[in-house]
């Protein structure tokens, strides 16, 4: 086996032959897949670019965050949440669960391993994964667990660099409304994050203006004390999807009235059908709707342009703001490092639609790209572990026990 260092100033390149799959990402997706593989007797190696597990949850989320779904819909495979956890665990409780999950399954990711590129080598039948520290990892299997929310997404809005007021940040940098106290804040994006950040701003005596560019479904988080999501999942077992959607919209109308009057136009497609077709989730209200009705959260149309002091809007209005927060979601970063192949789109999502997007070719797998949250992650992890577990067992039966963990250090002669 030969090695050709990319960095000629560093004369040594490490090549590591991995005993089992390489998993990229130590978030919930990577942890769940590693645990499921372990339960099938398959070892794995997780490479994580940050210095901890679940770095997105740990450092890129706001303080008041709680799971929007009940905990039994958010558990990872093979380990329940502690019984004493509340129905909707907090961010810190979820992080503690993930830490205990990693400890329980003895998952030890290699941290601060930023993958520069990964490509399949047809001559050897191995995936070659190169990290920033001049190390190359080789395996027959590559599992992409970086997910659909790897990097912050900013929409293309003219003038963003012109703004000279206060802060202009992505929601991933937002922690609490305390730093925006008494400010007039523009919140761009009306998903769950945008709604909840606006709620938090009001509670810290700020004045949020929430941009709603497109149609959006807003549902109550609970119906008569029962999770709306849970009600929907139960009804789908015996009723057609469109009937379930009609029921959910009836409950929403009873809770909020006609949201069009508030500037929140509903899509023509029902919430569950829209989720299945586009992956766009409905907003589950945790208190923002009452503040919108009272006028404490003001709804604005789409932003046409960011100005030096604020923004111009599609309806012709122009307003000044002290700060701007982009609650515009995240994007996959797969295209920046995965080389070759046509399994992913240019946006970094599997071309094969749910529920079959977890399997690529030549030992490539993906987990966390279903647009179905932690439920989708758990489903992917179980399927991947099942398929690789079968391949692993067949290899053992075929006397391939000599594929053991090996470490080689090559020194360039150039």
Curated annotation (Swiss-Prot):
Residues binding FAD, per UniProt: 25-30
Catalytic activity, as annotated: indole-3-pyruvate + NADPH + O2 + H(+) = (indol-3-yl)acetate + CO2 + NADP(+) + H2O
Tissue: Expressed in the apical meristems and young floral primordia. Detected in the floral meristems and at the base of the floral organs.
EC number(s) recorded for this UniProt protein: 1.14.13.168
Entry's Gene Ontology molecular function annotations: flavin adenine dinucleotide binding; indole-3-pyruvate monooxygenase activity; N,N-dimethylaniline monooxygenase activity; NADP binding
Cofactor(s) essential for the protein: FAD
Keywords, ordered alphabetically: Auxin biosynthesis, FAD, Flavoprotein, Monooxygenase, NADP, Oxidoreductase
Domain of life assignment: Eukaryota
Designated name of the protein: Probable indole-3-pyruvate monooxygenase YUCCA1
Organism: Arabidopsis thaliana
